Amino acid sequence: MKFCSSCSAPVNKRIPADDSRERHVCDACGTIHYINPRNVVGSIPVYGEQVLLCRRAIEPRHGYWTLPAGFMEIGESTSAGAARETQEEAGAIVEIGPLYSLLNVPHAEQVHLFYLATMTSPDFQAGDESLEVALFNEQDIPWNEIAFPTVKQTLEWFFADRASGVFSSGLEFGVRSREILPTEKI
């Protein structure tokens, strides 16, 4: 950040009074700019025993497979954002279920949230950010072509939980959570 969004004057990085972290501060108007992580919201769209994945048409990781997800928009909830991204990227209408995974990606200044989702029909089509969209059984997922560690981790947790009967037991389950390190590779 170089300029203040309030008055357009240049900003400087310093620790403001009564704070403990370096921030972008405008010396002209006194505005302190807090740079916060961005939320990436998505879903695990399920139809029967299959999961819907999208092959990315954009960078980063062009040509790799991912769950439908993207940046949360101002004015929407995380679950509404997950449903919107699923429709935009995969052309699928879903009923959003509970939050399933929360993955912290501090080196990318992001938090990834994935919701369980049930497709309302078998209809789907690639959106502008997807080369193709397909339903996969667990054994057919192209595991070596998954775009991001957060997606791979979420899918691994999902299939392990499904195999253990967590989803069919009717019992409450906790949100899966962990931090993704910058050194993690697919």
PLM ranges: what are they?
Residues 45-46, 53, 117, 135:
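Conserved hydrophobic "DFG−1" position in protein kinase catalytic cores
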Residues 72-157, 161, 165-167, 181-186:
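Unchanged
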Residues 21, 38-40, 46-48, 60-62, ...:
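Short connector loops at helix/strand junctions that flank enzyme active sites
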Residues 165-176:
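Short, flexible loop/turn segments with low-complexity composition
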Residues 46-88:
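Conserved Nudix-box catalytic region and its N-terminal flanking loop in Nudix hydrolases
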Residues 1-42:
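Acidic, metal-coordinating catalytic segment for phosphate/diphosphate chemistry
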Residues 5, 12, 27, 52, ...:
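Nucleotide phosphate-binding site architecture
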Residues 28, 56, 69, 117, ...:
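Active-site donor-binding loop signature of nucleotide-sugar glycosyltransferases
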